[in-house]
Amino acid sequence: MKIDILTLFPEMFAPLEHSIVGKAKEKGLLDIHYHNFRDYAEKARHVDDEPYGGGQGMLLRAQPIFDTIEQIEAKKPRIILLDPAGKPFTQAYAEELALEEELIFICGHYEGYDERIKTLVTDEISLGDFVLTGGELAAMTMVDATVRLIPQVLGKESSHQDDSFSSGLLEYPQYTRPYDYRGMTVPDVLMSGHHERIRLWRLEESLKKTYLRRPDLLEHYNFSEEERKLLDKIKEALDQGED
């Protein structure tokens, strides 16, 4: 995969080189470049200007963004504009991006963008219902979430398949050694070696956690008959005041 990031602060992306992104580069699975679009600004390196019609703040000018993208060697890139008004970023969207060969991220600053910049983009994406100073942190988050899904990047191909959201449910609780830590013990079922009982326990715990913390995820979840019965059991236990 090839990723190009347009930003006024390329140095902010240094931590990515020490994460899963750096490992993907070492394996030859990722080629990533950072472009300071101030270098392409014609007007005394000014990348922003006052909005027509008045108003507070400054807007990113179209020219530096257009010229930066036009010099990037890409055939059919997915061009993503980081915008608080965009569609929410999700695990499903990260999985979709992981199938692409070329991605371009545009990180904004100031009050917003000249609307004409949006004629370049294929996607307008938001990290959530809040506003950041710039798009860099959002871009780093999206790149990390996407790159780890590229085949062969993680040590085991199944490593991400049980992650929260990958299955549509939140992930079940997990434990490691020691068995007893300060009086807190590992659930006996996980020590049993009984694979089917462990599978059912994990599924029930995932359903319970999702029901309690993110019930919105269940609204469009495609339940199996087994999952539906387990959820009914969970609801009944909660109604009776059981853990």
From Swiss-Prot:
Record's keyword annotation contains Chloroplast: no
GO MF annotation list: tRNA (guanine(37)-N1)-methyltransferase activity
Gene Ontology terms: cellular component: cytosol
Domain of life: Bacteria
A Pfam short name: tRNA_m1G_MT
EC number: 2.1.1.228
Any one of the GO BP annotations: tRNA N1-guanine methylation
Record's keyword terms, sorted: Cytoplasm, Methyltransferase, S-adenosyl-L-methionine, Transferase, tRNA processing
Reaction catalysed by this enzyme: guanosine(37) in tRNA + S-adenosyl-L-methionine = N(1)-methylguanosine(37) in tRNA + S-adenosyl-L-homocysteine + H(+)
InterPro entries membership: Alpha/beta_knot_MTases, tRNA_m1G_MeTrfase_C_sf, tRNA_m1G_MeTrfase_TrmD, tRNA_m1G_MTases_N, tRNA_MeTrfase_TRMD/TRM10
Localization terms from the record: Cytoplasm
Functional summary from the UniProt entry: Specifically methylates guanosine-37 in various tRNAs.
Assembly with partners or alone: Homodimer.
Protein name in UniProt: tRNA (guanine-N(1)-)-methyltransferase
Organism: Streptococcus pyogenes serotype M1
